[in-house]
Amino acid sequence: MKTIFLVGGGTGGHLFPAIALGEELQERGYNVYLITDTRCEKYLLNSNYSFKIHIMNMVSISNTGIKKLYAYIRILAACITGFKLVYSNSPGLIVTFGGYTIAPIIINGILFKIPFILHEQNSVLGLANRLFLRYAKAITVTFANTLNLNNRYKHKVIVTGTPVRKALRFTPKRNFNSKNFQLLVIGGSQGTEIFSTLVPNAIKLLVNCDHDFKITIVHQAVAKDINYVKAMYTELNIEHEVSDFFYNIADKYKNSHLAICRAGASTISEIISLCQPAILVPYPISAQNHQLFNAKAIADNKAGWCIEQSTITPHILFEKIFTLMQSPTLLASTELKLREMKINAENLLANAVEKFIVT
């Protein structure tokens, strides 16, 4: 069976959908080769994926001075590595998921006349995808109304959604009437610094108001903030678990009644797959503000709540959490709306991939 390259790097948002597609394609009998970079290496720790994985040493070109020169040298080296990978494996197709790691592989794919398709997770077409779209066989998208997509390429669009990893493809049975209320705080694969102060201060207000709930917090924090966040929850006598990354994130979703999170495409796909009611706080300086569009797509479907970072305060967050804690019917109806938004993105994307494989 032919080899398929899956390429994505930089953040978990680019890596995890590639892994999800890899799992589906491997079940269909294809040889999968996952290519990412050193920034994503930590997300592969403790994993047991059976497909091949290559980790490239990429450096951001946003550096200045001697670091910028070093970055260009690394890019040249990555192009040489990409040449060797494509030449030695002769993939039947390349599928990319974003991040500048895709460039050396796509360039060599074009050189060797290997077809490739792009996947856009967000509601706004990213820079790398805009750059290579003219050469792509197709672009698979999460949102039918993806912005920044030139009309001349609309014929290449296939709506598939964003695939999620096998471990996250289930719908938990949550009891929203329970007085044991678990709150999940996630800031994407890299954590979110603002949540380190915003959420504990909102919980402080919650602890001091009159209610009969037992609150548990599971909080993914920026590594440098972990001790501070733990100390805050300990002072409030709140049961908590704080880490910079949860390898068993499926269990955290399964046991949580409400999430507070960013609105990156991977997170959005996960909360839809797991029907997780969530308060979305879009990252305000995401590329082309795509997280705001992602969050509004959820909120407009009454499948979650969007509060922009420029307006959110501990008191506003406290009021929203407190209202939802006391509204099990609203949480249940939100879960139902998310269930209605679920699609089998892994299957749809794998079907699209099979149309373009060179045998």
Swiss-Prot record:
It is a peripheral membrane protein. Its main location: membrane. It is an enzyme of class 2 (transferase). Transmembrane segments: none annotated. GO terms for biological process: carbohydrate metabolic process; cell division; cell wall organization; lipid glycosylation; peptidoglycan biosynthetic process; regulation of cell shape. One of its GO terms (cellular component) is plasma membrane. UDP-N-acetyl-alpha-D-glucosamine binds at T11, G12, G13, N122, R165, S189, Q291. It holds the Pfam family Glyco_transf_28. Pathway: Cell wall biogenesis; peptidoglycan biosynthesis. It is found in: Cell inner membrane. InterPro entries: GlcNAc_MurG, Glyco_trans_28_C, GlycoTrans_28_N. Signal peptide: none annotated. It catalyses: di-trans,octa-cis-undecaprenyl diphospho-N-acetyl-alpha-D-muramoyl-L-alanyl-D-glutamyl-meso-2,6-diaminopimeloyl-D-alanyl-D-alanine + UDP-N-acetyl-alpha-D-glucosamine = di-trans,octa-cis-undecaprenyl diphospho-[N-acetyl-alpha-D-glucosaminyl-(1->4)]-N-acetyl-alpha-D-muramoyl-L-alanyl-D-glutamyl-meso-2,6-diaminopimeloyl-D-alanyl-D-alanine + UDP + H(+). GO terms for molecular function: UDP-N-acetyl-D-glucosamine:N-acetylmuramoyl-L-alanyl-D-glutamyl-meso-2,6-diaminopimelyl-D-alanyl-D-alanine-diphosphoundecaprenol 4-beta-N-acetylglucosaminlytransferase activity; undecaprenyldiphospho-muramoylpentapeptide beta-N-acetylglucosaminyltransferase activity. The keyword Amino-acid biosynthesis does not apply. Its EC number is 2.4.1.227. HAMAP family: MurG. Belongs to the glycosyltransferase 28 family. MurG subfamily. NCBIfam families: murG (TIGR01133). Cell wall formation. Catalyzes the transfer of a GlcNAc subunit on undecaprenyl-pyrophosphoryl-MurNAc-pentapeptide (lipid intermediate I) to form undecaprenyl-pyrophosphoryl-MurNAc-(pentapeptide)GlcNAc (lipid intermediate II). This is UDP-N-acetylglucosamine--N-acetylmuramyl-(pentapeptide) pyrophosphoryl-undecaprenol N-acetylglucosamine transferase. It comes from Orientia tsutsugamushi (strain Ikeda) (Rickettsia tsutsugamushi). The gene is murG.
